[in-house]
């Protein structure tokens, strides 16, 4: 029998976007071909898809690291890079996805249900897409964004109409095998059932599913015994059935005390339910009681004795013997009636309306705050500035100048000045820290001296070609003047 795994922690990493291309069109008789660098391809995303043929999370137990392919780099001649293919990961029906903080992200129920667990990164723009009046042939391109990386917890919660709950060795597995074609492991020792067993039951022309889950002991809601491994698998059941062993020889146990103990555990577990439980709390689900093993004479007498007392709670009571196959048909049709009545009483599920929240006009999309780790420094946070920094190649001066222009147009520099930032102070955006120089890019017109360079970022102490030429002209002028003076002196 394959190993059953119903809870795993995985690491999902989506593909990164491809880098844009910085190239210039070269063709005979076309000296000004212009930029033709293509955009990078989008990175592949990781998508969970419910597959009815998958029944366990075992594959994730042995392969917890999942990564999607990255996008390809853009190329010249306006050729965009290929997008990375989305990675579709098959998960069982009833899988719950939680983030690293335990917050519910998705409840995957129903064949074909999809959920994007990690989004692929955007591809970087090529220099053809970055061309403008100021930059007719940009000597740079934007880098692709890294794909989303997440640590996720997957939990499997059995999807069944009826959940059988009871103490160990109460006969739950025997009952499932008697009313369905399921063949769970059956033995005469406690905790024989370690994994949920599902069976399909026919009630005339109708069918429903029954789940036999691991046995319950007092304190299961706090983790004793199989604890949450038991209780997790009954959250989705529409009807809960207490299977009571009327032939038990354990001292201090009787059908009434067993039912009270089971109900106490259900009540204690209900506040821990995560997310939206469409069927309501466990304490509100319909109940039925199966008094099992009445083929034993003493057990039959005990079942008859407590039957009326249990029925006073408003729960149907069924006397059953799986060995003699007695009372099975009334139980099957009684459960189907409870399921149909409960489901018909549930309100119709209305699809959630899409809520659009417009961004205010005066929302700049960033925030500047003092850096608590370093006096006099500042931290700029916001989706756009941080994305722009990730897309910038800091080995290219022209790309850095383009980033400075974008930040200035967004209003970052103006906000830094308002907060009292001084030239040379450290400014952190995302993972990068800069020495802020307001006179470098602030509102100055773009002056390009060559592809991949920005005159505003050149060091002022470096002597340029024009300065060297002027110095040589001055030296020649000085030499000529000195030579003329000497000649006049000799003639005199």
From Swiss-Prot:
Q: List, alphabetically, the GO terms of the cellular component aspect.
A: cytoplasm
Question: Which prosthetic group or cofactor does it need?
Answer: Mg(2+)
Region feature Disordered, mapped onto this chain: 449-492
- The residue ranges of the OBG-type G domain are 160-340
Tell me which residues bind GTP: 166-173, 191-195, 212-215, 292-295, 321-323
Organism, by scientific name, is Mycobacterium avium (strain 104)
Where in or outside the cell is it found?
Cytoplasm
> Which protein, by its recorded name, is this?
GTPase Obg
- Every copy of the OCT domain together lies at 358-438
Instruction: Tell me the lineage of the source organism.
Output: Bacteria, Bacillati, Actinomycetota, Actinomycetes, Mycobacteriales
Enzyme Commission code: 3.6.5.-
According to its UniProt record, which protein family does this protein belong to? Answer: Belongs to the TRAFAC class OBG-HflX-like GTPase superfamily. OBG GTPase family.
Q: Where is the composition biased (Basic and acidic residues)?
A: 453-469, 476-492
The UniProt subunit note reads as follows:
Monomer.
Positions of the Obg domain: 2-159
Where is the major localization of this protein? cytoplasm
InterPro entries reported in the protein's UniProt record: G_OBG, GTP-bd, GTP-bd_Obg/CgtA, GTP-bd_prot_GTP1/OBG_C_sf, GTP1-OBG_CS, GTP1_OBG_dom, GTP1_OBG_dom_sf, OBG_GTPase
- Its gene? obg
Q: Give one GO biological process term.
A: ribosome biogenesis
Q: Which UniProt keywords apply?
A: Cytoplasm, GTP-binding, Hydrolase, Magnesium, Metal-binding, Nucleotide-binding
Q: Indicate which residues the UniProt annotation says bind Mg(2+).
A: 173, 193
* Stored Gene3D superfamilies: GTP-binding protein OBG, C-terminal domain (3.30.300.350), GTP1/OBG domain (2.70.210.12), P-loop containing nucleotide triphosphate hydrolases (3.40.50.300)
Query: What exactly does this protein do?
Result: An essential GTPase which binds GTP, GDP and possibly (p)ppGpp with moderate affinity, with high nucleotide exchange rates and a fairly low GTP hydrolysis rate. Plays a role in control of the cell cycle, stress response, ribosome biogenesis and in those bacteria that undergo differentiation, in morphogenesis control.
């Amino acid at each position: 029998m394959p190993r059953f795994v119903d809870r795993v922690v995985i690491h999902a990493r989506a593909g990164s976007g491809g880098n844009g291309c910085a190239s210039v069109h070269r063709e005979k008789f076309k000296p000004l071909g212009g930029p033709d660098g293509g955009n990078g391809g989008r990175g592949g995303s990781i998508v969970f898809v419910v597959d009815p043929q998958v029944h366990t999370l075992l594959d994730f137990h042995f392969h917890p690291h999942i990564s999607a392919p990255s996008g390809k780099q853009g190329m010249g001649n306006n050729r965009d890079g290929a997008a990375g293919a989305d990675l579709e990961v098959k998960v069982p029906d009833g899988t719950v996805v939680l983030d690293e903080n335990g917050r519910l992200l998705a409840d995957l129920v129903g064949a074909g249900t999809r959920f994007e667990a990690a989004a692929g990164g955007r591809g970087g723009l090529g220099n053809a897409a970055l061309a403008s009046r100021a930059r007719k042939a940009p000597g740079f391109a934007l880098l692709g964004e890294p794909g989303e990386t997440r640590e996720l917890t997957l939990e499997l919660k059995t999807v069944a109409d009826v959940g059988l709950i009871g103490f160990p060795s109460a006969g739950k597995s025997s009952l499932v095998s008697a009313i369905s074609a399921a063949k769970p492991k059956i033995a005469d020792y406690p905790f024989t059932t370690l994994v949920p067993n599902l069976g399909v039951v026919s009630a005339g022309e109708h069918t429903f599913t029954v789940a036999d889950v691991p046995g319950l002991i007092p304190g299961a809601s706090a983790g004793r015994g199989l604890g949450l491994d038991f209780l997790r698998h009954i959250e989705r059941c529409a009807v809960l059935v207490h299977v009571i062993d009327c032939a038990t020889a354990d001292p201090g146990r009787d059908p009434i005390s067993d039912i009270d103990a089971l109900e106490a555990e259900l009540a204690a577990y209900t506040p821990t339910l995560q997310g939206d439980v469409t069927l309501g709390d466990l304490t509100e689900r319909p109940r039925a009681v199966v008094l099992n093993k009445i083929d034993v004479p003493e057990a039959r007498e005990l079942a008859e004795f407590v039957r009326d007392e249990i029925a006073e709670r408003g729960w149907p009571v069924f006397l059953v013997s799986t060995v003699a196959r007695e009372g099975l048909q009334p139980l099957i049709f009684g459960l189907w009636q409870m399921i149909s009545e409960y489901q018909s009483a549930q309100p119709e599920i209305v699809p959630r309306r899409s809520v659009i929240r417009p961004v205010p006009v005066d929302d700049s999309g960033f925030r500047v705050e003092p850096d608590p780790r370093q006096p006099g420094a500042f931290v700029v946070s916001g989706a756009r500035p941080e994305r722009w920094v990730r897309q910038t190649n800091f080995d290219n001066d022209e790309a850095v100048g383009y980033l400075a222009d974008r930040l200035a147009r967004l209003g970052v520099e103006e906000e830094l000045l308002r907060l009292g930032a001084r030239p040379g102070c450290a400014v952190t955006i995302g993972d990068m820290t800069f020495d802020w120089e307001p006179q470098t890019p602030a509102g100055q017109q773009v002056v390009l001296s060559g592809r991949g360079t920005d005159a505003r970022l050149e060091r002022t102490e470096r002597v340029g070609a024009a300065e060297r030429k002027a110095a040589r002209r001055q030296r020649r002028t000085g030499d000529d003047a000195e030579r003329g003076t000497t000649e006049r002196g000799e003639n005199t």
